[in-house]
Each structure stands twice: as C-alpha cells, then as structure tokens.
Amino acid sequence: MIKIIYIYLLIIFFNCASQAPPQGGPRDIEGPILLGIQPNNKSNISMDNPIVLSFDEYIDPSSIVNSVYIYPSIDVSIRVRQNKIVIKPLNKWPVDSPVEINLSRNISDYRTNKI
C-alpha cells in the first residue's frame, strides 16, 4: 500500500510542471521605422563620407537589392549592418549638386514586414 502511495505521489510530482516551449512574445507585424539619417539632411559633408540610415529594428539584407535609388546616379556600396543601411560612394559624392536618396517600400525586416 505504501508503494502505491509512493508511486502515485511520484507521478503527481513529475506531472505538475507541463513541459512546453516558451510562449514567446507578441507576433512582429510592424515594419522597420526610419529613426535617423547621418549626416543630417541638407548638411555639407566630406566627399567620401558614408550616409547611414538608422532603423528601429534589424533590416533583412536581401530586401535592399533594387530598393535604394540615388540621384544623380553614382557608383555606391550599400551595406546592411544590423539596423543600419550604410551608403558609401565608391569614388566621391558629387561636388556641387545635391544627392537624393529614395527608399522603396520593399525594404523589410527579417519577418518580411515592409517599411
């Protein structure tokens, strides 16, 4: 009889905490939000300084392809570093003309939420 009670208590004891993966948090349904640009808009910069776009979450590097447009058209290197897009001219930025950078809405985070 004591063995039965002992076995019953062991079964109850080991079944108290149900084993399951953690629930996680709420599902990410918001796209990345542009937080800032360095250097500031309409500022004079060195001819070879990069332009850095900062977002509130990590950017999927594969979403950048054909999503950043630069006018006038110049050769640039575009890299993604965590939550930043770094645009650096391969030669130099144009001397006496403004540079316009347009972002397409195809830029997304790792959950494919677009900006």
Where do the model's predicted regions map?
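Sec-dependent N-terminal signal peptides
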Residues: I4-F13
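Acidic, low-complexity Ser/Thr/Gly/Pro-rich repeat segments typical of extracellular/periplasmic
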Residues: C16-I115
